[in-house]
Amino acid sequence: ASDVYKRQVVNGKFSGVLEKSNVYDKEYGTEWEFLRDVLIKNGVPDQKILKEDQATFTYENAIYSRQVTDHAELEIERAILCCKSYHARRCLMYYQLLYPKTEFYVVPVNADGITRENWKKNEEGIDAVTGELSRIVKQFSLMLER
């Protein structure tokens, strides 16, 4: 995401954040603190990073992100969604629901080695993808309740 931010273009290729214990050596209390540190160390200005650290699942991420941007009176025209490749469709679905006028660039990352080509070849990949399917059904029902 920081690379895309710096280049201000999306060409469909992004290497993702590689875990580097010599660069990211702090104790992080939340995922947001870690990701903020990654972005700052990769050239994204701190004032350009919005804080949302209350969500416990993806649909809440979208809801709370919307609250943060509304509170800051920001009209989001374009946004980058950077997430695991098998999670990208569900993530996009939620953010499109909460930000219907926004153009999204989805930047999938194969951070855990699970790809479109190999997910069905091992138990870890199968569990990750079928877990996504289960969460789509469960969280979609929550969306309908709202």
Question: What are the language-model segments listed below?
Answer:
Residues 2-121:
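A structural signal for short, hydrophobic/glycine-enriched beta-strand patches
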Residues 113-146:
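C-terminal capping/extension of enzyme domains
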